[in-house]
Amino acid sequence: MTKANEDAIPEGDYKYVWTPTSNVPLDDFLSKYKPSMVENDGTKPWIWVRKGGDTRSFTPADEIAVLEESSKILTEITDQIENIKNDPSIPTRSNKKTGAKSKKEVREELQRDARERFEEIARKYKYLCGKWLMFASTEKIDMIWSSLATSLINGPLADTDAFCAKVATTPRDANPNHLHVICLYFPDVYNKDAVTKAMKILLRNHGFNLSGVKSDMYTLLGIDSKHPSGIPSTIWKNKDLMDDKEIQALKDAFFAELKGGKSSIAQSPDKADPNDKKPMDVSAASADKPKTKRKQKDIFASDDDDDNDGEQKRRAELMQKKKATAVSKRRSDKDKDSDEDQEKPKRKAARRS
């Protein structure tokens, strides 16, 4: 899948897309197509849930123009960043007496300028779309994805500008520490109020860990955390929208309520008492918070096998393949993730999503 179409909503006979006009209920769709169970053979990298029509207003010609203009800027900035690195006249440290700026300061000025120019191009062609990024481990992804998708269609996220969500399926060579990326799409990610409203719901009603807001233009350009330009891969970091204390308070309130055993479908913040918001999905949140281990349900179980007589055999083969992969990877000295984006959080000894 190329960078140009990673964010394009599939059309035609791609069966891993749900819309309000689909002939199956959302719950059935989510039960049938679980990201931990759908193996990406190169033809089904994503599972999509769409709230309504695509609200993005650019044309294919606009997208081509965006790519051409922004690519020139990116090449220019990348070359300048490399020149700064190799320029001996620019000091490593700034000098207050002479007023000389450090390499880091000069580099960051160029990167800020590039971000501003990218935004100008985005507004010029109305290429303003983008997404909130989240990550979850394979063992937790099904519940977390189901919670998000349900919220988008029938829960508090339905009252936001978010119009679509997608989750990465499981690569054939997934290692034991694999993380699935989840994207929640907005027509205008430069609308700070809109993305912040959704952020509060994702924290307070779901307890999710968030990795920032990324413009589709940046995906189109291939800008990630390892890009040689050093341009930040997200246009909004969590701290740009809310302070750490507020973020932690919302998550603490969610998990405190969860610990107390309360369970109800949450209202949106606009319709509910801000001091009395309930979690959207207790089971999904439990998957995102460490707790006493219990015997888990077979992750290969499915609720609907009617359309595939060989499904049971495929599951057994897939389970054996996953077990073999896990054993092989544990014996390896290297552990390389294969997620679509480079913004995923670094994994520590304690596994979390």
Can you name each region flagged by the protein language model?
Residues F29-N177:
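Acidic, polar low-complexity intrinsically disordered regions
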Residues S22-P25, K140, I144, L148, ...:
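Alpha-helical interaction elements in eukaryotic regulators
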Residues A165-D305:
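Structured partner-binding subdomains within large eukaryotic complex subunits
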Residues D281, A287-K293, D309-V327, K344-R352:
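Acidic, serine/threonine/proline-rich low-complexity intrinsically disordered regions
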Residues S31, R123, Q248-A256, K313-E317:
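Polar/charged alpha-helical tracts
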Residues R294-D305, S328-S338, R351-S353:
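Short linear regulatory motifs embedded in intrinsically disordered, acidic Ser/Thr-rich regions
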Residues M1-W18, S353:
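Phosphorylation-prone, low-complexity intrinsically disordered regions
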